Amino acid sequence: MKVTIKNINKEIYVFEVNGDLTVAELKNLISEKHNQTPSWQTLIYSGKILEDKRTLESYNITDSGFIVMMIKKPREAPATTPAPSTTPAPSTTSAPTTTTTAEPTPTTSSTNNTSTTTPTSVPTPTNNTPATPNPTPTTSSTPGSTSTTSPQQSSDFATGTELEATIKNITDMGFARDQVLRALRLTFNNAERAIEYLVSGNIPAANDPEDEEEMEGGGGSGDNPFEALRNHPHFNLLREAISKNPSIIPGILQQLAQTNPALVRQIQENPNEFIRLFQGDGNPGGNPGQFTLQVTQEESEAIQRLQALTGMDKSTVIEAYFACDKNEELTASYLFETADDE
């Protein structure tokens, strides 16, 4: 069978393989031919993330279709600073160090639409472990860092069609729907975190059996459920903070969930109305339909890659990108699935 691979740089790789080839074997083949690390590859076909153990023919891949390949490099672990010691450290220590050697920059050409691929790997900073660990937890004050690793750290605001697409993508990977719904709720609809829960099999029991029904139903009464909350003190603080820096939404929601989980649930279930409230209360004298969103250089590059990959307009890509919690792979999957539906 003919398998066409398309990456975000519009490069196309074509392979002639047997239908019983597994996805993992295809990733290894891509690695051999085009030097792409298999563990960094995410393959998507018809809005589904391909599982390593399944065969290509099980996904009914056609000769005219193509597989989207996303490359996601692992995040670098920040260097750990040893606690100050009152005695000088010996010249030799048994503390392990971890280093990663950068791979050479290869040049490869694809079968069709020949182009050049130059993947590079940045060495991981050395992680020095102190000889005597301090059992007392410490909090770092480094800007941009966070002291929590809770799976509820981020929110993708998925709702309605977007949420159902996310649920379908995950259930298609073989997980039970009720477990998927529970994992998504626990992670504020963050698909990547939810999958981590599902893979580990350690999903905390739901506190409220009606929560999953509320997630599916969309919740909220009236045209805009936030009209009654317009003067709520928590909501006003949230609105002011987000208007200044939208990137702090996940952290604020996590804190707000401790004091007003009902409000957070309404925000998750009604993201469009939530955004319209910002637009309606925008800068005086400005366009009431205009909302300025600040993005980092990395986020801007991801949005541009998604535009080039899908051919969709920038506003559509941005909306999907933030709805998917800035997950580039999930955004690509959602955009392709939306395009197929239309």
UniProtKB/Swiss-Prot annotation:
Transmembrane segments: none annotated. Residues 77-157 are annotated as: Disordered. The keyword Repressor does not apply. Pfam families: UBA (PF00627), ubiquitin (PF00240), XPC-binding (PF09280). GO terms for cellular component: cytosol; nucleoplasm; phagocytic vesicle. It is found in: Nucleus; Cytoplasm. Keywords: Cytoplasm, DNA damage, DNA repair, Nucleus, Repeat, Ubl conjugation pathway. Belongs to the RAD23 family. May play a role both in proteasomal degradation of misfolded proteins and DNA repair. This is UV excision repair protein RAD23 homolog.
